Amino acid sequence: MAGVDEVGRGALFGPVVAAAVLVPIEAINQLQALGVKDSKQLSPQHRSQLAQALPDYVHSYGISFADVPTINRVNIRQASLLAMERAVQKLPVMPAWVLVDGRDTLPHIAMAQMAVTGGDRKSLLISAASILAKVWRDTLITRLAERFPGYDLASNKGYGTAKHRQGLRQYGATPLHRPLFCRKIIENPD
């Protein structure tokens, strides 16, 4: 059985990232003992520790993303689904079932699926995927922050904090900002 989740859907900057984890049924209790839960409920340090430990507890995992041009072309919802599909396709063994965080199943994946609203809080498989995706994306954004100073990306990870919004108003958008998300901030400073 596999779980898949995405992160970065509401960000102003950078890709949407997804991870899929394939976990043998008998190993699910080990995830709970390890302390796996929704990545948003964990400190950055704890998330990082779990992301390092998870490969020892899961059969396999896949991580993928949809970049800003893709988000602009197809919209954030479709880009999120695409990133999750790609993450599942990176698994070396196709699972019998996929639990998908959110209200949508993956339209181009021909296997049994269940959409789980709030799945990152309800399913250890989806929680494990959310941790891997979050750590991967946060690491990427932290590296990109060096190329794009002035937006406080190392702290906000691309989300719309006050400092990030101020940077957009002062410097404009970079090529890795999502234009549709940023336009209103830049045009309407209030």
UniProtKB/Swiss-Prot annotation:
Cofactor note: Manganese or magnesium. Binds 1 divalent metal ion per monomer in the absence of substrate. May bind a second metal ion after substrate binding.
GO cellular component: cytoplasm; ribonuclease H2 complex
GO MF, one annotated term: manganese ion binding
Cofactor section: Mn(2+); Mg(2+)
Catalytic activity, as annotated: Endonucleolytic cleavage to 5'-phosphomonoester
Residues the entry annotates as binding a divalent metal cation: D5, E6, D101
EC number: 3.1.26.4
Domain RNase H type-2 residue range list: 1-190
Subcellular location: Cytoplasm
Family according to the record: Belongs to the RNase HII family.
Protein role: Endonuclease that specifically degrades the RNA of RNA-DNA hybrids.
Protein name: Ribonuclease HII
Taxonomic lineage: Bacteria, Bacillati, Cyanobacteriota, Cyanophyceae, Synechococcales
